[in-house]
Amino acid sequence: MAELSLQHVDKIYDNNVQAVFDFNLEVKDKEFIVFVGPSGCGKSTTLRMIAGLEEISAGDFYIDGKRMNDVEPKDRDIAMVFQSYALYPHMSVYENMAFGLKLRKYSKEEIDKRVHEAARILEIEPYLDRKPKALSGGQRQRVALGRAIVRNAKVFLMDEPLSNLDAKLRVQMRSEIIQLHERIGATTIYVTHDQTEAMTMADRIVVMKGGYIQQIGTPKEIYNNPANLFVAGFLGGPATNFVKGTYTNGFFQVEDMKIEIPLMYREKLSSYQGKEIIMGIRPEDLHGEGIVADTYPSANFDFEIEVAELLGHEYILHGTLNGQKMCAKVNSRLEPEAHSTIKLTMDLSKIHFFDMETENRID
């Protein structure tokens, strides 16, 4: 398929507003890359520059070693799927899928072959004669995917393709897109603001904020080793807890509570003696007392529950630790109650520390 290279790419609009800053990324052949971040972070703008729908203000973009900055969108061998299905309402499913191929003067036989092959892969062959209005949202999205598949393009670009679907259908379509990628092997860049989509679908994730790349890595790398406060707080649900405290002589102190820091962190924190830092701990790494194995460093503390949300197999607890807001995921067997205090254990092998000024993880 294709390898992509974006080198020092910027996007500056005519009003001098810069949307993307020094974007650098190497995409391997057949890789599934997800751009994730909040609205306005530059992820869709970057995707549109790759597609040729936005001009690159500075830097270079290559496909298989060929510079693409000045190549017309139609000549980039890229297929794109948008948030909107963008189907022609007066055309049948077959006609919608065949439309782009007709414009490119493919033979009737080749068009028929490609449309039926894509329809078979997407399991929409029974609907080829129907109009879009007769289809469900999921079926319409499959038609939009099929229109891209028939192109046999080197690169697939997907701009929030599932955001118009309900929660149950999004889960189903996530799985279908992953399976589709495995079957056709196209190099794919997928844009979303949904961190669940990013974590479950990507080979690698590009986390963006304010036009800058915050971190690039596999879902596991980013989840376990977030580069900064933003990444730690953005990926994972509920979000990572952040607790401000002071590091002194091997202890992290929050008000009148002291947590003894494991030796593996102390060398990293040696230059922060007596300084205020931020500790990050994910809700799933707070457990009922006695749950953490003795082989792992841990700390016990009293947790004042304000709200207890039962999700069947677990509770999401919202409360405070020495006056600072925290959230914990605990097994439903604990049967915690709102406006009560329980003992929780913090798995200290899973904590992170962040610099107060730079907000970067302390390594």
Name each region found by the language model.
Residues 73-230:
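ABC ATPase nucleotide-binding domains
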Residues 16-18:
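Short coil-to-beta microelement around the adenine-binding A-loop and adjacent beta1/P-loop entry
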Residues 57-67, 213:
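ABC nucleotide-binding domain "signature motif"
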Residues 23-34:
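Pre-Walker A (P-loop) beta-loop-beta motif of ABC nucleotide-binding domains
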Residues 249-306, 325, 335-363:
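Glycine/charge-rich catalytic "coupling/switch" loops of P-loop NTPases
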Residues 51:
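Helix-to-loop junction immediately C-terminal to a conserved catalytic motif
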Residues 36-38:
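The feature captures the beta-strand-to-loop junction immediately N-terminal to the Walker
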